């Protein structure tokens, strides 16, 4: 019984701190790894256009608009064209990035919360601890034992809820 109390607290602490501090970094890191090993044409094209854009911008900044106007105008047109093309391509990449991050976030949510739900389902009949019958009215004892625990005990579901609220209130 004591191991159920402690494991529930530790699991809730892990989930809370993972969501608060590590989830965004994990998702961003996974996306960066995917981009570096991916053969996605849109990602490669976006990177190539960005490299060309930066090269043209560097040349444009090095060229005087008064002394070498023809060269500067040609580079400026090329820069504007690449800039528009990069913006269009970036919109496609942004949609893909948002979808990738949303799917990975859902996977992590299922992984962390799913484990908690599994434990709650598996141990739903196991009481976490018992309360004295004179301490609370009978309806309160019944509510604390929901969904399937023994009357007069605190169920794992109620205990999990209390632990989560306490942790989120403290941290």
UniProtKB/Swiss-Prot annotation:
- Which top-rank group of organisms is this from? Eukaryota
Keyword Iron (UniProt): no
**Residues recorded with modification Phosphoserine:** 65
Instruction: From the UniProt record, list the coiled-coil ranges.
Output: 38-95
Segments in the Lumenal topological domain = 1-4, 130-153
Q: How does it sit in the membrane?
A: Multi-pass membrane protein
The record's Gene Ontology biological-process terms are:
tail-anchored membrane protein insertion into ER membrane
Q: Which UniProt keywords apply?
A: Coiled coil, Endoplasmic reticulum, Membrane, Phosphoprotein, Transmembrane, Transmembrane helix, Transport
Q: What is its main location?
A: endoplasmic reticulum
In the record, what terms sit under GO molecular function? membrane insertase activity; protein-membrane adaptor activity
**Where is the protein localized?**
Endoplasmic reticulum membrane
Q: Where are the membrane-spanning stretches?
A: 5-24, 109-129, 154-170
GO cellular component: a single term: endoplasmic reticulum membrane
User: Topological domains (Cytoplasmic): residue ranges?
Assistant: 25-108, 171
* Subunit structure comment from the entry: Interacts with get3.
User: HAMAP family, from UniProt?
Assistant: Get1
Family, as annotated:
Belongs to the WRB/GET1 family.
Q: What does this protein do?
A: Required for the post-translational delivery of tail-anchored (TA) proteins to the endoplasmic reticulum. Acts as a membrane receptor for soluble get3, which recognizes and selectively binds the transmembrane domain of TA proteins in the cytosol.
Its recorded name reads Protein get1
Q: What is the lineage of its organism?
A: Eukaryota, Fungi, Dikarya, Ascomycota, Taphrinomycotina
């Amino acid at each position: 019984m004591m191991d159920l109390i402690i494991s529930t607290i530790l699991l809730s602490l892990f989930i809370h701190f993972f969501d608060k501090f590590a989830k965004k970094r994990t998702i961003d890191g996974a996306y960066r790894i995917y981009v570096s090993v991916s053969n996605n044409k849109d990602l490669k094209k976006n990177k190539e256009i960005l490299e060309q854009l930066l090269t043209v911008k560097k040349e444009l900044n090095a060229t005087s608009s008064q002394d070498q106007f023809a060269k500067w105008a040609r580079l400026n047109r090329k820069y504007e064209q690449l800039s528009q093309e990069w913006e269009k391509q970036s919109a496609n990449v942004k949609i893909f990035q948002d979808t990738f991050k949303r799917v990975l976030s859902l996977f992590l949510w299922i992984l962390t919360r799913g484990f908690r739900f599994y434990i709650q389902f598996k141990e739903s009949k196991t009481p976490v601890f018992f309360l004295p019958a004179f301490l609370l009215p009978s309806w309160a004892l019944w509510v604390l034992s929901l969904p399937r625990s023994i009357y007069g005990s605190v169920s794992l579901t109620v205990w999990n809820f209390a632990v989560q609220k306490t942790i989120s209130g403290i941290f």
